[in-house]
């Protein structure tokens, strides 16, 4: 829940949170009412929140001059925390928890749209959490003690890391992702990485290092190779299941 202290009364809040009859991309009252043809601005509901929960940012870590801080929970008895929540109308596609619904997964993928830059580590972390549960993700189905399970993550990307929130710093992103990859593999999870390189980028050293071994990194130079690649991964996993 994100709140803007500057919007501490509902009149100011109503001017910034609502819907315009002239289009979804007109996101404040003044711009809406400036449209032609009798525009109508409808303020949002003060008792609901249409925002989204995303990964946290990467603030500067503690140091001798920047000590760690114990951030207390919001005090809901104070006036500055009682006004309506700031709304946000551009949430990305939600992550789908583990599911056997192939139709649901295909629908989710088809609804995605390419936007922004690349941060592989964010997707990798969410994939890990959806596999093991915790936080906003439900716990995975209980495992039968009579069977041995193999947990697998396939990291697919069409580009190198270029974006960390509001600034670009590839080396820092790569360093954090390398740590995530190491932790995933240390947890006994098999990690495949697939680089779709159609733009002439260098082969990703990071993705090669992230893969569980050299046979689990795939470099594709055409999107047409994706189906065959995933079929090969599926075959490898099927052979593993039969052998075990």
How should each PLM-predicted stretch be described?
Residues 1-244:
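P/S/T/G-enriched low-complexity
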